[in-house]
Amino acid sequence: MSTGNAAIRGAEHFGTVSVAMVTPFHKDGTIDLKAGVELAGYLVDKGCDSLVLAGTTGESPTTTNEEKINLLKAVRAELGDSVKLIAGTGTNNTASTIELSRLSQDAGADSLLVVTPYYSRPSQEGLFQHFTAVADSVDLPICLYDIPSRSVVPIELDTIQRLSEHENIQAVKDAKGKLPEALQLLQNTDLAWYSGDDPLNLPFLSVGATGFISVIGHLAADRLRALRDAYDQGDLAGAQQIAASLAPLERAQGRLGGVTMVKAALKLRGKDVGAPRLPILEVDPAELDQLEQDLQDAGV
């Protein structure tokens, strides 16, 4: 694993250390914009230079376009240009994705995160045409989100290669985890690469990723910043130590699910962002002691 000079490709649009931010809700289930703005400010103070709003961890399937846009506008109004705002706009409906992408552009997004269409299992040519249609519809940089564990269908290497020729398609959030493919695409395209799976943050840096779009960063954004800085400075041992220290948070996420874990963990640390919306549930009270232990083991 080589070290030093972490990639900066794409950082001007997508940042380097990003959190896929949860969407706070009031007790009655309505969106809590004030808490959303406060959480965004907290994450920026902890070291994030970009945030994903209304992504998977932001409960995009169960929030309306109006809620998504209102959150984006509220965070932009409060934080200004101090952070890059990446709007999650991907759905399994091309027309709906285009509509939300245009709304997000008008609301002040710096870039877009567009997930692979899920459930309908399109062909690779269908994926190519879907992403191309979205990219043609806006004037913003787009990050493809490749997550076959949720979408079932991966974006194959050849499809990403073809999509990279579109001027607006500039990055990939990789939750597929095939590092040799990532390395090949980084060498053969101008795409920026982002780890979309926290346990692989350090390995992705080693093949040329610019940074991370993290879930556990809600609780340890400062440590993720330190991890990237250590790697960039050639301190592999330091980067490895930080990565290992975050394993309890990664285990908790794997056990409970990202939204459930983050919302419960933030509440344990005095930041109540409300419960998830159905069909995602709050953490089982029987799990709270173990979650508290995970947080303590990770030093947060």
UniProtKB/Swiss-Prot annotation:
Site positions (Part of a proton relay during catalysis) are: 56, 119
EC number(s) given by UniProt:
4.3.3.7
Cellular location of this protein?
Cytoplasm
Q: What is its main location?
A: cytoplasm
Q: Which CDD domains does this one have?
A: DHDPS
Name the Gene Ontology molecular function terms of this record: 4-hydroxy-tetrahydrodipicolinate synthase activity
Which transformation does this protein catalyse, written as a reaction? Answer: L-aspartate 4-semialdehyde + pyruvate = (2S,4S)-4-hydroxy-2,3,4,5-tetrahydrodipicolinate + H2O + H(+)
What's the protein called, per UniProt? 4-hydroxy-tetrahydrodipicolinate synthase
- Could you tell me which species this protein originates from? Corynebacterium urealyticum (strain ATCC 43042 / DSM 7109)
